[in-house]
Structures are given as C-alpha cells and as structure tokens.
C-alpha cells in the first residue's frame, strides 16, 4: 500500500486505482471481531461475555435468514427458526467495562406464525422502502410487515411451504416471486393482492428464485429436479431456457431473453437440487449452488457453463435455500463470491474458482446441560451497503459481524495495549510512592505525639 501511495503522489496511478487497491486490501482482511455480539438480553456494566464458551444468541432456536436495508445500510432484519423476527440498529450498541459491544433489537416479535412456531425461511426489506419487510416460511404464507410495529399488514396463503421469495430492486411492478413446494413459481402482486399468476416448467419443488439486477421482467429459478430456468414474467409461455452444466459453449445468437437462433429446453444445472442463485451486479453471470456440493457459474448471454472449479470444500446437503453472496464490484478488481459453508465462510474468485480465503466461524463449547450440540451451520449472508462489512447468520442462533482487520490495525491495537500497560505500571508506581510517603508522615506524626 505504501508503494501505491508513492505512485499516487508521483501521478503514475489514478485515484480510482488507489481506492480499488485499498478496498481489495480491506476485503481480504475480513474477520469476525471477538467482542461484537447480537443478543435479545442486555448486559450489566460489569458482566463479562465468555464468547468462547457460549456466545449470546439473537434467536434461541436458530437464525434462518438475515437482510440489511440497501438505502442506509443501518438496519438488519433477522428471522428465526421459531417464527420470531427482530430488527437491529447496526449503529447503536451497548458496551461494558469488558469491552464487549452488544447489539440489542430495536423491535422483536416472538411469534409471527398463527399455526404454531413454524420457522421463517426468508426475510427481505421492501425494495423501495425499509419501513416495510417481507417474510416467507413453513406456515405456507408470504407476509408483509410494518417495520415499526412488527405487525403483519397483509398475508398471502400459498397453500404450500414457501422456501424463499425475491423482489426486484429495479422494477416498476410490485411482484414477489415465491419458491415453494409446488413445482410452479408463484408470483404475488402486492399492488392488487392477487397470487394467481404462476410460471410452470419445473418438475420438482422450487427452492430458489432471483430477479435480474438490470432487467425488471427477467427471473431465474432453481428446483429439486436439478434444473435452473430463466423466465420473462410478461410471457405466459414456457421459460426462456434451461441452463446445462454439460454445455461450455452456449447457444450462438441467443441473447438470454428468449430471442435469437434458438433456446434450450432440456438440461440440468446440477446433479442434485438447485438451492441457491445469485446474479452478478451487471447481470452477465448467474452463480448456482446445489445439493451435489457444487457451485457453478453460467454466462447468461449464451447460457454457457464457465467450468470454474471451486474444489471439494463445499458443504451443501439440505433442501433449504443456501445463497452465495457477491460483494459490490467497486470493492474488488476481480469478481468475488462468499459461500456459506459449515462452520466457515469460503471466499472464491468467480471465474477461476480459486479459493482466496477461509473465514473461520468462532467455535463455542456447549454448556453441560445441553443434550445436543447445535450445528454451527452458516444459513445466510448479507452485505452492508456503504461499508466493507458482511454479516452472517447461523443455526446456533448467533449473528456475526465480519470487518476488516489489517496488519496496521493489529499494530495499532498492540501499541494501545502497550500504552495502557505502561500507564498502569506508572500509576502503580505513583501509588506505591504515595503509600510510602503516607507511612513516613504517619511515623513522624506518631513520634511528635510521643
């Protein structure tokens, strides 16, 4: 970095190159701070958190999904496996003398399901206003909530378990795409309240859906039949095409919108269920994950499989949504993918598939009265807008923050600790001298009295 600063002063590199190099440096330095926690219960001033033994939990039954508002990057929404939801202010926290930073919920609803404590599968903020949010769950419903009162303002019964939902951030419509046990993708119109429109084509339960980041009418879906389909929601016909993991060439003349020379009707994206979809920021690539423990990248202009090999480290065996995360492209000169693995988060370079870093999730030791140790499985990832920060949710009920900690930060902390230790030593020495002086004065006073 010092060489970049020198070259910037000499004018040999642009300010943009310097900023991107610094952002890349910070991106590679992400790690979980030991003293940042999310908890439903506050701490006393002198209470100590033993995170290595049992960290505070945000949801006692586990956290299934999190989301961060894309406008301010300030509010985090979490949904629990017991149908509870909570909203957290990332800029407001409590601290104690031990140095622990504790986030407490701004609002918390212990139960959102009317048919028992059936877990939430997905939470998301309303795409154009963070004062409302959506939830889907095992109670077969999609719900629209008020962020201030945490009360449901609308409920849509889809008559089958809703594995995930997605909203478009660029659309003029208010369609919510829902992935459910039904083989058709259900579209719910928040403007009219209808949920009759569906996209038929899959032969198994739909597990994941994702809207194109640039085209408001293009949608991708993945299902248990191993297929990944793209759709134009304005068309009543079949899907635009199917992605094929065995095709590394693609369809010449195909524009990804159902037009061109031809479209593919058969093919599989994975040998197992497709349970995760993520578009690149420009919409050129689609990243898919499957229960065959593979992650694949497709060029959506041709449908070609890029053949990026992400190695054997991926864990994915549950028929639940497991979505990788791609940070904003301005932070890196290469496309980066974060994969929520068991007990860790893996960082990959997208086009080559090379593993860049493992972000280890701090392990906790279960208490003696815990009969079963909860899995420390990563269930969801969310990027904080306007910051180089990532947040992860876990099946053990914790929410973790990932921030850059560079070598310069470590040196500054060591210098701070050394300064504190020196100050404590000097203070102890001054106290010793005061005590000795007081003893001398007391001795002289006693002699005079005698």
Question: What do the PLM-derived regions correspond to, one by one?
Answer:
Residues 2-41, 250-256, 309-450:
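Terminal intrinsically disordered, low-complexity extensions flanking WD-repeat/beta-propeller proteins
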Residues 28-62, 102-112, 260-263:
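A short helix->beta-strand "capping" segment at the edge of beta-propeller domains
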Residues 46-49, 87-109, 139-175, 181-206, ...:
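Per-blade loop-tip surfaces of WD-repeat and WD-like beta-propellers in eukaryotic adaptors/scaffolds
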Residues 67-73, 124-130, 166-173, 203, ...:
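Loop/turn segments within WD40 beta-propeller blades
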């Amino acid at each position: 970095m010092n060489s970049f600063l020198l070259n910037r002063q000499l004018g040999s590199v642009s300010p943009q190159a310097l900023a991107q190099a610094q952002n890349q440096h910070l991106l590679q330095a992400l790690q979980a701070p030991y003293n940042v926690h999310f908890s439903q219960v506050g701490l006393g001033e002198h209470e100590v958190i033993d995170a290595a033994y049992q960290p505070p939990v945000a949801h006692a039954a586990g956290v299934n999904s999190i989301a961060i508002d894309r406008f301010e990057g300030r509010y985090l929404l979490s949904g629990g496996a017991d149908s509870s939801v909570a909203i957290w202010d990332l800029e407001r926290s409590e601290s104690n003398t031990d140095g622990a930073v504790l986030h407490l919920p701004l609002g918390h609803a212990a139960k959102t399901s009317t048919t028992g404590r059936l877990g939430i599968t997905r939470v998301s903020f309303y795409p154009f206003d963070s004062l409302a949010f959506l939830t889907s769950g095992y109670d077969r419903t999609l719900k629209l909530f008020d962020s201030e009162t945490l009360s449901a303002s609308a409920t849509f019964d889809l008559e089958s378990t809703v594995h995930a939902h997605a909203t478009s951030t660029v659309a003029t419509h208010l369609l919510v795409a829902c992935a459910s046990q039904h083989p058709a993708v259900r579209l719910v119109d928040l403007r009219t309240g209808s949920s009759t429109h569906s996209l038929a084509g899959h032969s198994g339960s739909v597990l994941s859906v994702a809207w194109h980041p640039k085209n408001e009418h293009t949608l991708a879906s993945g299902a248990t039949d191993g297929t990944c389909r793209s759709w134009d929601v304005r068309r009543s016909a079949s899907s635009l095409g199917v992605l094929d993991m065995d095709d590394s060439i693609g369809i010449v003349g195909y524009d990804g919108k159902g037009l061109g020379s031809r479209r593919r009707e058969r093919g599989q994206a994975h040998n197992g269920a497709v349970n995760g979809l993520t578009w690149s920021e420009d919409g050129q690539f689609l990243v898919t994950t499957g229960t065959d423990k593979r992650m694949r990248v497709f060029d959506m202009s041709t449908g070609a499989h890029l053949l990026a090999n992400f190695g054997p480290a991926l864990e994915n065996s549950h028929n639940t949504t497991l979505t990788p995360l791609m940070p904003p492209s301005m932070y890196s000169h290469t496309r980066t993918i974060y994969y929520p693995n068991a007990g860790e988060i893996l960082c990959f370079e997208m086009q080559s598939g090379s593993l860049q870093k493992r972000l280890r999730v701090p392990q906790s030791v279960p208490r003696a009265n815990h009969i079963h140790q909860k899995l420390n499985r990563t269930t969801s990832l969310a990027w904080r807008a306007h910051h180089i920060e990532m947040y992860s949710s876990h099946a053990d009920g914790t929410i973790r923050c990932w921030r850059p900690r560079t070598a310069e930060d470590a040196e500054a902390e060591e210098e701070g600790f050394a300064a504190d230790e020196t100050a404590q030593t000097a203070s102890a020495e001054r106290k010793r001298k005061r005590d000795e002086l007081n003893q001398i004065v007391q001795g002289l006073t006693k002699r005079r009295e005698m």
